[in-house]
């Protein structure tokens, strides 16, 4: 399932002509799968892992978590996290069970669209 989610996210980015890296983590934030698209920047791999870790830790898309920094700016100091759009949780009965992180597109919003495509692939 993790590989299917990662490939779906990478495929969505490819269709949009974006070179990204994708990571899928489990409930405990352990990396299950990483895929790096041709031409993805060297920073994108680590960023994708951190976005997925952040999304599963808070059970929320990382775009929503960015807004929390206004009231709790020290959240960004938690090791392993990255508060930029591009991470999307996978839930079962409302609880986080995994997350998909994507990095490398020109905007975090694009990254997150691709991450959500990965999550959606799990429902197929």
Question: Where are the regions that the model predicts?
Answer:
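Flexible, solvent-exposed loop/hinge segments and secondary-structure transition points
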Residues: 1-124
């Amino acid at each position: 399932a993790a590989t299917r989610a990662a490939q779906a996210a990478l495929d969505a980015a490819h269709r949009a002509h974006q070179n990204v890296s994708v990571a899928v983590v489990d409930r405990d934030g352990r990396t299950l799968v990483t895929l790096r698209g041709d031409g993805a920047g060297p920073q994108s791999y680590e960023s994708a892992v951190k976005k997925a870790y952040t999304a599963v830790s808070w059970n929320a898309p990382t775009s929503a978590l960015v807004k929390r920094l206004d009231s709790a700016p020290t959240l960004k100091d938690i090791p392993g996290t990255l508060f930029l759009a591009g991470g999307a949780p996978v839930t079962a009965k409302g609880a986080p069970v995994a997350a998909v992180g994507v990095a490398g597109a020109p905007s975090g919003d694009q990254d997150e669209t691709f991450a959500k495509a990965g999550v959606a692939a799990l429902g197929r």
